[in-house]
From Swiss-Prot:
Pathway: Carbohydrate degradation; glycolysis; D-glyceraldehyde 3-phosphate and glycerone phosphate from D-glucose: step 3/4. Belongs to the phosphofructokinase type A (PFKA) family. PPi-dependent PFK group II subfamily. Clade 'Long' sub-subfamily. InterPro entries: PfpB_PPi_PFK (IPR011183), Phosphofructokinase_dom (IPR000023), PKF_sf (IPR035966). The gene is PFP-ALPHA. Keywords: Allosteric enzyme, Cytoplasm, Glycolysis, Kinase, Magnesium, Metal-binding, Transferase. It holds the Pfam family PFK. Tetramer of two alpha (regulatory) and two beta (catalytic) chains. Allosterically activated by fructose 2,6-bisphosphate. Regulatory subunit of pyrophosphate--fructose 6-phosphate 1-phosphotransferase. One of its GO terms (molecular function) is ATP binding. GO terms for biological process: photosynthesis; response to glucose. Signal peptide: none annotated. This is Pyrophosphate--fructose 6-phosphate 1-phosphotransferase subunit alpha. Disulfide bonds: none annotated.
Amino acid sequence: MDADYGIPRELSDLQKLRSHYHPELPPCLQGTTVRVELRDATTAADPSGEHTIKRFFPHTYGQPLAHFLRATAKVPDAQIITEHPAIRVGVLFCGRQSPGGHNVIWGLHDALKVHNPKNILLGFLGGSEGLFAQKTLEITDDVLATYKNQGGYDMLGRTKDQIRTTEQVNAAMAACKALKLDGLVIIGGVTSNTDAAHLAEKFAETKCLTKVVGVPVTLNGDLKNQFVEANVGFDTICKVNSQLISNVCTDALSAEKYYYFIRLMGRKASHVALECTLQSHPNMVILGEEVAASKLTIFDITQQICDAVQARAEHDKNHGVILLPEGLIESIPEVYALLQEIHGLLRQGVSADKISSQLSPWASALFEFLPHFIRKQLLLHPESDDSAQLSQIETEKLIAHLVETEMNKRLKEGTYKGKKFNAICHFFGYQARGSLPSKFDCDYAYVLGHVCYHILAAGLNGYMATITNLKNPANKWHCGASPISAMMTVKRYGRGPGKASIGVPALHPATVDLRGKSYELLSQNATKFLLDDVYRNPGPLQFDGPGADAKAVSLCVEDQDYIGRIKKLQEYLDKVRTIVKPGCSQDVLKAALSAMASVTDILSVISSPSSVSTPF
């Protein structure tokens, strides 16, 4: 099986054309001389969890933010990396494949070779399993030739498993030592980058010389925080899904007799569903975050959709398209509680056929109410991160079944006057995640690969490659590196009334912000989407010409660029230091003190634990 990794692909004409496309580097990374600026130490976004994070990451917490600048940039204290000794770097894919992953490796390889042709890049075959077993493939120009700007992870393969246990961590360390690696680059999402942080801490503690770097690559779009604006693969996934959805919308409008229920891959968060809604304008989307915030039951959701169907029928519209995120099932309070009971029994070794009889009375009643196919799917063993196997639970069929039952009831009672309700169900996920990457994902991933090299060249450990100002062209991107521990939060698990909760620092999936601009845009258009059939077809992925440079709606409407703002703040502070120094006038000093007192008072209130939202 290992012999299949890294072999040349058979490429179509379009794939060949794409393999010749070379992404543009931002000015700060062009050439062989890059300046790195390390300034103030980072801190946790949630002050209440800082003590716990420090305790878990004593060696890698509180490291400074890194900015990569042009060699000509005149910035105090920024260092030019002049020496580039030959280094050995390992790279692996962790988690589900996401379009653009290959370009991270391509960018890393190019950066390694341009700075020292003797540098070596080793790819681990089969993800973390290949890391533990020390199965490697040397990445060369020949190996990369047919994987540039291509989808999938088939150059190296991947794994879903975490690097969690002591045995696994020790195996990873043994591999890095045996292969004499100066750096280890882990490409993945929330879980994989949490693992990268723990590995980096362990390596620092044991004086292992390997530096660990994480890269934000996940189709779910849920590795988002103040440092990370977007994830490699999300742009492609949403564009491919949006075309499929809009095709279905056109079909629904043509036949005028079907309701399509479409479940979208994306794990617990609803980012993919929200973005696809903003791109294709289906009639309705049920976001998991809305359901959780309003504590909607499965019956509430059913009634909500049925009321929408009835409202459309009153406008002589007996068709529609409804999007559902795959994480919706875990957002429904009573179903989530049922899953927790089932998973607890599975962990105790109770066989699936015996679980129903051991559930609590209310859970048993809900379980028996559900259709047989859903009961069977809920009994699947949880993933390695203890979440349900969401891609295997056909939520769209469950919701369609419940809606159809209710609509037939209303039809019989005479409260619904429309045509007989007909549902067609789809699950979109696998169709998109192996797609050719969009131009944005090709560019973003390639540049992140270069950033990984500069992180290692600067001797940094426990960092994630980050780029901000992404909604603008690549020549305006801000490249840097952020300590992964600074992105962590502490999730608290209550252990009953009066019991102390336990804190586990980790990267937690970012959910859709119901106060954010993307959700606001959806809310403003929800009624129009529901009743007016303003379906929008963005068409297939474009690699050149109109549409090629289009970016995710959610990326463009949010006002981000954290690194750029940090830089701007530092410039202001530097100006203050230049103006206010011993010898300045009393008026200048008094004005500075007054302004600073006001600013610090405001910031103290905003940053207090009570005003910081904490994930629970």
